[in-house]
From Swiss-Prot:
This is Probable inorganic carbon transporter subunit DabA. It comes from Sulfurihydrogenibium azorense (strain DSM 15241 / OCM 825 / Az-Fu1). Forms a complex with DabB. Zn(2+) binds at residues 408, 410, 651, 666. Its cofactor is Zn(2+). It is a peripheral membrane protein. The lineage of its organism: Bacteria, Pseudomonadati, Aquificota, Aquificia, Aquificales. Coiled coil: none annotated. The keyword Lyase does not apply. The keyword Lipid biosynthesis does not apply. It comes from the Bacteria.
């Protein structure tokens, strides 16, 4: 089947989650089976992207002392040995620090120095090595990187590709729309291909389209061509991959799509626009080869121009002269001579060598692959050594803690934890932000599930939020706000009513736009008064009985069937609905007319079974709750000496006019706030029946209180405070004051890194200011994970750069706890780290560019301007400040406090984490306090630091 080639081509795509549940991910996830360095080499070629920062960036860090000289020299020595280069490591270091960052200028200076003489053998060697002696190879290498429409545009200054691209984006964005536009694409419910086919009046299947494209254009490899096609639509394709691989995603159920159909539609559109707009005589790859053979120098020069290889002087000549042979030869001779002179200069003045070929090969190897990898490894090694020496120190705390506080591992919790520990004697813990409760929660006023767990998992339990107070006032206010919002959105998304919108509702737009930009604090207070206050609620965490499951499922489907017929304008009696439901459940025949309605609304036996299963999964049995509680407490080493108050503090963020708000929430909660998870775990841990069955003794007087850390403002709010007994209220108020002090200290600390923030109030104002592009730094500057006891880092100032997960290896007899940490929180941290890395090194390719040009599209993501690929990474403002990187792009460094043998044994019993460590996507450091030694995994072995 022809679609197999498309399926294989799409295998390099990652998944991209929608903005509403933004999940940090590695854009090179499908290359993680390769070593980090090899994967980056492939990605550089495949995506035409940068995969490291420029050498000058690393040299700047070296000059600031962040890269240790001994680490750099050790890695230079290793590099020289592995590549059989006989050079002095100190002289190579001089080249890396003093010459390489300005290599282009060094070549120009050398070229203009008449005293430098170059032997002919060096010129010939460079010419051959760069492929300038074999134009055919150059041509074949380059054309594989382009679509046929792009080649026609490059060679003949046409605009076919842009027209094709914009049309494809227009269609796919409308098909994938999740409620942004008020003018929906017809036939979406029939699936992508049927919708596309009817829209473009086609009577063909994907197989036919692929075969037609192949016959028309004769590409050298259909699979390679399709891969380039998916890369041009990288964001859209990655979102489709998420859609087709996510069971029961509502929009995928309603409007199904797959990558093979999408790829086929792109082949069709490109074919159509080439036929319509191509003014050249080149109709296929056969014609292209013939044209190349007759116009070799012209073709190569045009490709050089497009790839920014040709210098401005020769670009000008390309358009003012047709002597392409002469232009090409002059250009490459100049390039070769400047390179050769620089090599001779370098050999003589820096390396004291007359073996120019060896110097050339050294520089070539460094410049092509090794230089920046050597820098990044040296930077990581420096951090590993510096922090390893910090964490190996032992600190003893004898005073009884005032309270325990458990936070998410998120880097933004580090400063708050540190400041709380210094305000008074608090013992803090870190755990993945779902707090041991993976659940799908249905809020009392919502009709959909929130998946509150890491993105790589699907929760098998459903929890319902149920109000304990009357909700009439809340519902009344909420309906008013929703109605107003719908009116405004309807006007905004209808292209023919902007005038009406301004005339009728200009005052309201003005209130929001100017108020939230010029007077954000005032507007926030008004909004707070208008916004309905939700009623008190509790969670239905106890499992439903079989009878309740039957009843609720039948009621659900009764309503669904009744509403389906009502929408179709068909009157149906109660007894008929019950009869249809009975037949549906028992797989009996239903009349054809009724069946048509059921099919249209996807009311099937399969869906009934799914809903029945979801109702069956509501809540946990008592034994399941005991297991959740036991696992949670042992995971973080909280097994004894419980104080009266144990605070479980999740985190979320609040910012206005920010499409990426979900990215600032909790990654372990699927891009949602951790509020629900901490409440659920507190309810479980406070249950008398649960405590009675635990093997860990929790005193009767110990209370678990849920809280939420707003990472944008560092304010902490607590919930369910009615659990606090009257005789403990004074102590509780004191604890809340301590948290407030810690939050204030954290805000002041963050001021120094936030641009244009002069006082702590500015931090709060940023969260409600519509014009603020950087409400907080989020997870930028993340560096590593520390897995161990809080005592080991209690005197360290980690500046919100570490994910902190509590772990006590002494209670982890069978390594099960460490394996859970490696398989869960470590992987989440690696996804976050990788996304920040690639969004920094090439923000246009792997990030999402500047927020200034962002437009939300289809409510699933953003694109730049009116048409672009769906942007899959982080905005420029998240990782850069004033044209300088704020985030330091390095691999995640995982520090694990445990005996070396224990870590090796646990890691070897995992699959993906072990692969990431072996392939050095994660740098693993072991803090072995029993040996009083620190070990780093490097090049397949643990080495002592």
């Amino acid at each position: 089947m022809k679609t197999v080639a498309l399926k294989e081509a799409s295998s390099i795509l990652p998944k991209y989650w929608p903005l509403t549940m933004f999940v940090h991910h590695n854009p090179l996830h499908e290359l993680e089976s390769l070593h980090f360095k090899q994967a980056l080499k492939i990605a550089k070629d495949l995506f035409d992207a940068k995969v490291y920062m420029d050498p000058s960036y690393y040299v700047d860090l070296y000059r600031k002392g962040k890269v240790r000289k001994d680490s750099l020299e050790k890695n230079i020595e290793e590099f020289l040995r592995e590549n059989n280069f006989n050079f002095n490591k100190y002289k190579v270091r001089k080249f890396l620090t003093d010459i390489s960052p300005s290599w282009k200028e060094y070549k120009e200076e050398s070229f203009n120095n008449p005293s430098i003489k170059v032997p002919d053998y060096l010129l010939e060697y460079i010419k051959k090595d760069k492929g300038y002696d074999n134009l055919d190879n150059l041509f074949y290498t380059y054309i594989k990187k382009y679509l046929f429409s792009e080649i026609l545009d490059i060679l003949f200054d046409q605009n076919i590709y842009n027209v094709f691209f914009n049309d494809a984006v227009e269609f796919i964005s409308r098909f994938l729309d999740e409620g942004q536009t008020s003018i929906t694409l017809p036939f979406r419910e029939q699936g992508y291909w049927n919708c596309f086919r009817q829209f473009y009046k086609l009577d063909k299947h994907p197989e036919d389209i692929i075969e037609e494209f192949e016959n028309t254009f004769q590409p050298p490899s259909l699979q390679d061509y399709a891969r380039q096609l998916y890369i041009r639509f990288f964001g859209w394709s990655s979102f489709i991959k998420f859609r087709e691989s996510t069971p029961f995603y509502p929009y995928q159920e309603e409007f199904p799509i797959n990558l093979e159909d999408f790829g086929s539609s792109l082949l069709y559109l490109e074919n159509q626009y080439i036929q319509e707009l191509n003014k050249s005589k080149i109709k296929n790859y056969f014609d292209l080869m013939a044209f190349y053979k007759e116009n070799k120098y012209y073709v190569i020069l045009k490709l050089f121009e497009h790839r920014k290889i040709l210098t401005p002087k020769y670009i000008s000549k390309l358009y003012t002269s047709k002597d392409y042979d002469n232009i090409f030869n002059k250009f490459i001779n100049e390039e070769i001579e400047s390179e050769a002179k620089a090599i001779v200069n370098l050999s003589t003045k820096v390396f004291d060598k007359s073996d120019y070929l060896q110097t050339y090969n050294l520089v070539k190897t460094l410049k092509e692959d090794e230089e920046c990898y050597l820098w990044i490894k040296s930077l990581e090694d420096s951090y590993a050594l510096n922090f390893g020496r910090e964490f190996i120190k032992e600190y003893q705390i004898d005073e009884k803690p005032k309270a325990f506080a458990v936070f998410c591992v998120d880097v933004r919790s580090e400063a708050l934890r540190r400041n709380l520990e210094r305000v008074d004697n608090y013992k803090t813990f870190g755990v993945a932000g779902f707090f041991g409760v993976k659940m799908a929660l249905i809020e009392f006023d919502k009709a959909h599930e929130l998946l509150l767990c890491p993105a790589m998992e699907i929760p098998d339990k459903v929890v319902l939020e149920v109000p304990t107070q009357k909700t009439q006032d809340y519902e009344k206010r909420k309906k008013l706000l929703i109605s107003l919002k719908k009116i405004l959105e309807g006007l905004k998304n209808n292209p023919y009513t902007p005038f009406f919108a301004v005339e009728s509702f200009g005052w309201l737009f003005g209130y929001k736009l100017f108020g939230k930009t010029l007077f954000p604090s005032v507007v926030a207070k008004i909004d707070k008064k208008i916004k309905p206050k939700p009623p008190k609620t509790f969670y239905m965490i106890d499992k439903l009985s079989e009878k309740e499951v039957d009843t609720y499922t039948d009621k659900f489907f009764y309503e669904k069937i009744y509403q389906a017929f009502e929408k179709e304008g068909i009157k149906i009696k109660d007894c008929e609905v019950k009869d249809i439901l009975s037949k549906l459940k028992n797989n009996e025949n239903i009349s054809q007319n009724y069946q048509k309605v059921l099919n249209r609304y996807r009311i099937t036996k399969q869906y009934y079974d799914y809903i029945y299963n979801r109702f069956s999964n509501i809540g946990y049995t008592l034994d399941e709750q005991v297991i959740l509680a036991e696992n949670f407490l042992r995971l973080i080493g909280m097994v004894e000496d419980f104080p009266e108050f144990v605070l479980l503090v999740g985190h979320g963020s609040v910012s206005d006019n920010n499409p990426y708000e979900s990215a600032l929430d909790c990654g372990a909660c699927g891009g949602n706030s951790g509020y629900h998870n901490v409440r659920a775990m507190c309810m479980i841990l406070n249950k008398k029946e649960v405590r009675e069955k635990l093997s860990i003794r929790i005193p009767d007087g110990t209370i678990f209180i849920p809280g939420l850390h707003n990472t944008t403002t560092d304010e902490i709010e607590f919930y369910d405070e009615d659990l606090v007994p009257e005789n403990s209220l004074d102590k509780w108020e004191e604890i809340k004051k301590d948290f407030k002090k810690a939050g204030e200290k954290t805000r002041i600390e963050r001021l120094s890194s936030l641009p244009y923030a002069d006082n702590p109030e500015d931090v709060i104002v940023r969260s409600i200011d519509w014009s603020e592009m950087r409400p907080e730094w989020g997870l930028s500057k993340n560096l590593g994970v520390f897995v161990g006891k809080s005592e080991s880092r209690i005197n360290s100032v980690l500046k919100n750069r570490f994910f902190l997960h509590s772990y006590d290896y002494k209670i982890d007899v069978d390594n099960s706890i460490l394996k859970r940490i490696l398989n869960g929180p470590l992987l989440i941290a690696q996804w976050i780290n990788a996304e920040h890395y690639f969004s920094t090194v090439d923000n246009e390719k792997f990030g999402s560019g500047s927020k200034v040009y962002h437009n939300v599209v289809s409510r699933i993501g953003v694109f730049s301007g009116n048409y672009s690929d769906l942007k899959i990474g982080l905005p420029y403002q998240t990782v850069y400040v004033e044209d300088r990187p704020f985030h330091e792009p390095i691999r995640l460094i995982a520090f694990v406090e445990a005996p070396l043998e224990k870590v090796v044994e646990a890691a070897s019993q995992t699959d993906h984490p072990m692969m990431l460590v072996k392939n050095e996507w994660i740098r693993l450091v072991v803090i072995d306090k029993e040996k009083n030694k620190v070990f780093l995994f490097s090049n397949g072995n643990f080495v002592e630091l």
